[in-house]
A protein has these predicted regions:
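C-terminal motif of bacterial Sec signal peptides marking the signal peptidase cleavage site
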Residues: 18-22
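Bacterial N-terminal signal peptides that target proteins for export
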Residues: 1-13
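Extracytoplasmic
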Residues: 42-44, 56-60, 77-79, 103-105, ...
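Low-complexity, acidic Ser/Thr/Pro/Gly-rich terminal tails and inter-domain linkers that flank the onset
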Residues: 32-56
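Residue-level recognition of well-ordered beta-strand positions that form the cores
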Residues: 50, 62-66, 109, 123-125
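Bacterial signal peptide processing site
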Residues: 24-27
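Mature extracytoplasmic domains of secretory-pathway proteins
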Residues: 55-99
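Short, solvent-exposed, Trp/other aromatic-anchored flexible loops in extracytoplasmic proteins
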Residues: 86-140
């Protein structure tokens, strides 16, 4: 009986580890960057940022903005700034919902400005609070 209980616990532990590992993976159409998404509260606005791609050809992030007070009238491309490994990656483009409303979603894209290694810092201004999402891609 004791052996059966130990075996059951071992199976449950392995199943839990597989579930945890699967939750960290992206499904079809998900992130190929290998970087985790970030959810940040900026005052009354909640922002979810998922890195989709970050390499020497450029960067793209799936961005969701949600609020229940006021409208999201900002120009997301103009409000965004990306720095990778200390290098400014310049201006962004936005392919997504137009200004207005309580919920917006789209893809924020940057052309490459160099190496896709080091600390990644994506800031978004023009919101009720500061938004800074960071990741790190090891050199080499």
């Amino acid at each position: 009986m004791r052996g059966l209980r130990v075996a059951s616990m071992a199976v449950a532990t392995v199943a839990a580890l597989i579930l945890v590992a699967a939750c960290g993976q992206s499904g079809p159409g998900g992130s190929s960057s290998g970087l985790a998404s970030r959810t940040i509260s900026a005052g009354s606005v909640e922002i979810t940022i998922e890195p989709l791609r970050l390499d020497t050809s450029g960067a793209s992030f799936q961005v969701k903005l949600d609020t229940h007070s006021g409208d999201l009238n900002m120009d997301v491309a103009r409000a965004a700034h990306l720095e990778v490994g200390g290098t400014d990656w310049g201006s962004a483009s936005w392919v997504g919902d137009p200004p207005g409303g309580h919920h917006r979603e789209g893809e924020l894209r940057f052309a490459s400005a160099g190496s896709a290694r080091g600390e990644i810092r994506l800031t978004i201004s023009d919101l009720p609070g500061p938004v800074l999402a960071t990741w790190n891609i090891a050199s080499g």
